[in-house]
């Protein structure tokens, strides 16, 4: 996520083309031609010993002979010379370099050289980049592109060229167009951090084939998506496609889970990609999900309506006030409804009247206007009428409007007019609805991320006991644990299992059954047969000694016949669970090669494929995220309530999933967990059969997770000067209500010192931003005092680091009635220790000149205090890890 050098790459002031040429088909010629044609304002310096000048620009024979150091260099020579040229550029002090072609065996040396000179690399095997606002075309593409607000990042040169050609035909603009190539250094996450802060970029589109660091990607994407919509198209969904792309990009459901968790939106194919470009380029943000449709024909409106229904969209309901206004504005016989059918003879004036009335209405959140070719109402005239209505109406700038002018030839001019007016336009009713639902789903994803999680009823977690059990199993040489061995681990996390007994043979199985009572379940115990059902290794409802004896002997005989090499470690005997009216579920945890542990929920089966039969989520889970996983499984028919007499307890299942998530986060030894079946009966959940795969683990246990979990190790009990004990801990999403109550007990004066303005009310979004933080990017510590009656926040301190992890901005706020207890100092000392341990170099903050308490505290803790009376601020700075 480093931003070092990206300014020089994306906003260079000078460029050197290494290997510039006058031969038309050479890379050096194409790069020089495009740079000069793009209108770049800075110097472009061709470097070649073969020519005195290239395309009329004085050439320099070597890198060393350049009159000054370029911000950006482009290597256009034979790949064999890459390393020596990169070394020369580093010695010259060049900050960034685009490598157009290279061989994988060069990569380690290239990366080492770049790191030595603190140089950033784009590529290798990159098409280059275009930055129209800088007049920069440092690419092979001969297609000029217009200035726009959409940034496009691609891992494929072929897809990049396709999008460029498509956008040129439609005169669509971009803020940046970047082809990453093999991402040896600069990667998607670096660019997302840059574009999130770029004023020329309002939306981002990604084409991805693989990830080098899932955690960095999810962190950067989540941060950027809070302010700008980001759409993703990901290829390589099938193993065959991954093989073709030479990329192991993991399970496709894992990508869906990561994209949703980061607040992004995924589009599935090229057709949707083109619609997404149109949407991101022109559509205004949605304030809600209700759609109003107006059309000059019932058929296209019906097609739109069908697609909306298939995608679970919402149709707006018209108020009587709006209906009356439409009746007065439109001819007699027009049925006032949604969709509004203006009839096939609707003139441009009818369109304008209808739109003017609808612009006065608050009944909908987006307006779709459809036009079918008609002799009575030419498409161009109707388009001009719509544009005119939006231009002159006071609400025209604020209403989200989509247009669908059907047809091809007859609608070309109308689509051009809409594009010039900044209105999204699509060729089909279905495509328009697809685009609308993209933005609806994006809005839902963002809303989901900002919801305040509910607190679970109670969570059991005896981490030390679980670790001890797993470690002992590893020391004993076990790689797989069966139900009776896993049960103590699950119970340590509050997951209920059935009591299980081990029998060496059929005779002992009969003896156990006689002791515990019938009916019983009998299960094979073999480390070599993971799926017992493959050999009928599970027998249920055995009611007599004879049935148990017969089932046990038959089970062992079947294994000896079908799996002669399999080891048989006896049998498991369980009391038969009451399955009447219950539902059988399956919870699986697997490790994805890209995103790490995945939690999967479904109903199971012998040939169980997560891609088809499970809803998938990334740990860690809170109650809200677990609830969304359950709802997703139900909605997508991964869980069906066909046999349950009692409805599924969604809250109870969500809590169990949170417990599974906590187990996986806390215990990195667990490689795989399969609870199948999980018996759900009302609010009771029982793991009937469990398999756990384990392996020794060393190092940072959090490194395997795509999302950093809550850092329990940072919790600390502190005694204040008045003797009260409080817990210093990282902030949690569940803290939102407590944080609001805390702010209510801070005086307006103290809030003004903290926020530099008068804030009358903190919205849910404000509080969500404060509590739902990414622990990889920022940290907030709260001081919490707990009594029998309540738990309350007494103070907060936070630090937000820059993407390069060099500087962090800090703030601290203590409840106004608790000043003088040393709370602010203790909180700030904890924050200083944390930022120092994470390698930051400086901790910076600002306050007001009359905030004497903060200034005094800063001086005591070693901050440099710079009072800037002209600006009305005091800058505070503390060096942390310098020298």
Question: Could you tell me what each predicted segment is?
Answer:
Residues 1-689, 697:
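Catalytic-core regions of core metabolic enzymes
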Residues 543-545, 693, 731-734:
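A short, sequence-level motif marking secondary-structure junctions
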Residues 674, 693, 824, 828:
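Acidic, glycine-enriched active-site microenvironments
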Residues 691-693, 878:
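Short, basic/aromatic-enriched C-terminal tail that caps enzymatic domains
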Residues 698-883:
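Long, contiguous binding/interaction regions
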């Amino acid at each position: 996520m480093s931003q070092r050098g990206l300014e020089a790459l994306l906003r260079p002031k000078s460029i050197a083309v290494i290997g510039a040429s006058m031969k038309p088909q050479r890379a050096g010629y194409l790069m020089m031609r495009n740079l000069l044609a793009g209108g770049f304002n800075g110097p472009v310096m061709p470097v070649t010993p073969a020519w005195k000048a290239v395309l009329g620009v004085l050439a320099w024979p070597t890198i060393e002979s350049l009159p000054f150091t370029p911000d950006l260099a482009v290597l256009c020579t034979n790949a064999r010379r890459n390393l020596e040229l990169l070394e020369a550029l580093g010695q010259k002090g060049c900050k960034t370099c685009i490598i157009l072609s290279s061989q994988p065996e060069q990569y380690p040396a290239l990366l080492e050289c770049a790191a030595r000179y603190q140089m950033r690399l784009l590529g290798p095997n990159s098409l280059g980049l275009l930055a129209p606002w800088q007049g920069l075309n440092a690419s092979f593409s001969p297609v000029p592109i217009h200035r726009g607000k959409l940034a496009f990042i691609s891992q494929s040169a072929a897809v990049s060229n396709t999008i460029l050609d498509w956008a040129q035909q439609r005169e669509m603009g971009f803020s940046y167009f970047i082809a990453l190539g093999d991402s040896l250094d600069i990667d998607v996450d670096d660019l997302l951090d840059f574009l999130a802060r770029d004023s020329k970029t309002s939306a981002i589109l990604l084409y991805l084939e693989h990830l080098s660091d899932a955690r960095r990607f999810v962190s950067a994407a989540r941060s950027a998506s809070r302010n700008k919509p980001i759409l993703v198209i990901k290829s390589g969904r099938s193993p065959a496609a991954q093989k073709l792309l030479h990329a192991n990009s993991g399970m496709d459901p894992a990508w869906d889970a990561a994209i949703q968790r980061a607040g992004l939106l995924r589009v599935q194919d090229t057709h949707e990609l083109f619609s997404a470009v149109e949407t991101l380029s022109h559509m205004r943000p949605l304030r809600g999900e209700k759609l109003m449709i107006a059309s000059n024909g019932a058929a296209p409106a019906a097609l739109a309506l069908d697609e909306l229904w298939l995608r679970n969209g919402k149709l707006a309901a018209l108020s009587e006030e709006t209906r009356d206004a439409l009746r007065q504005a439109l001819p007699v016989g027009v049925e006032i409804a949604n969709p509004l059918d203006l009839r096939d003879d609707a003139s441009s004036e009818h369109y304008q009247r209808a739109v003017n009335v609808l612009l006065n209405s608050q009944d909908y959140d987006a307006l779709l206007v459809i036009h079918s070719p008609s002799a009575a109402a030419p498409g161009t005239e109707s388009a001009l009428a719509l544009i005119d209505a939006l231009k002159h109406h006071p609400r025209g700038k604020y209403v989200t409007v989509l247009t669908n002018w059907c047809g091809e030839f007859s609608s070309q001019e109308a689509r051009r007019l809409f594009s010039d007016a900044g209105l999204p336009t699509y060729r089909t009713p279905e495509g328009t609805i697809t685009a609308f639902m993209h933005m609806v789903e994006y809005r839902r994803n963002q809303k989901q991320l900002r919801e305040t999680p509910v607190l679970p009823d109670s969570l059991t977690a005896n981490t030390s006991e679980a670790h001890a059990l797993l470690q002992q199993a590893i020391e004993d040489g076990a790689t797989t644990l069966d139900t009776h061995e896993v049960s103590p681990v699950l119970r340590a996390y509050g997951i209920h299992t059935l009591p299980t007994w081990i029998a060496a043979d059929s005779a002992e199985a009969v003896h156990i059954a006689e002791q515990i009572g019938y009916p019983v379940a009998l299960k094979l115990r073999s480390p070599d047969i993971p799926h017992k059902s493959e050999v009928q290794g599970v027998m249920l409802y055995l009611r007599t000694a004879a049935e148990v004896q017969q089932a046990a002997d038959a089970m062992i005989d079947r294994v000896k016949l079908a799996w002669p090499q399999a080891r048989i470690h006896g049998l498991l005997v369980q009391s038969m669970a009451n399955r009447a009216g219950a539902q059988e579920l399956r919870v699986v945890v697997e490790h994805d090669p890209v995103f790490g542990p995945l939690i999967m929920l479904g109903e199971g089966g012998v040939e169980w494929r997560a891609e088809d039969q499970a809803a998938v989520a990334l740990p860690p889970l809170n109650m809200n995220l677990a609830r969304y996983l359950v709802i997703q499984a139900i909605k997508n028919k991964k869980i069906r309530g066909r046999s349950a007499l009692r409805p599924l307890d969604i809250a109870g299942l969500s809590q169990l999933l949170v417990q599974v998530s906590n187990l996986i986060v806390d215990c990195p030894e667990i490689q795989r967990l399969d609870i199948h079946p999980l018996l759900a009966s009302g609010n009771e959940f029982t793991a009937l059969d469990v398999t756990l795969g384990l392996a020794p683990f060393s190092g940072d246990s959090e490194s395997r997770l795509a999302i950093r979990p809550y850092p329990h190790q940072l919790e600390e009990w502190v005694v204040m000067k008045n003797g009260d004990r409080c817990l210093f801990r990282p902030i949690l999403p569940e803290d939102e209500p407590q944080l609001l109550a805390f702010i209510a007990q801070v005086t307006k004066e103290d809030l003004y010192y903290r926020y530099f303005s008068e804030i009358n009310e903190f919205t849910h979004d404000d509080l969500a931003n404060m509590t739902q933080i990414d622990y990889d990017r920022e940290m907030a510590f709260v001081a919490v005092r707990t009594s029998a009656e309540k738990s309350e926040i007494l103070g907060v301190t936070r630090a937000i680091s820059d993407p390069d992890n060099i500087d962090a901005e800090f703030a601290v706020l203590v409840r106004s009635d608790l000043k003088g207890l040393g709370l602010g100092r203790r909180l700030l000392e904890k924050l200083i220790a944390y930022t120092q341990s994470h390698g930051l170099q400086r901790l910076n903050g600002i306050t007001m000149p009359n905030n004497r308490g903060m200034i005094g505290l800063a001086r005591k803790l070693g901050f440099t205090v710079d009072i800037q009376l002209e600006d009305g601020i005091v800058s505070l700075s503390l060096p942390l890890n310098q020298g």
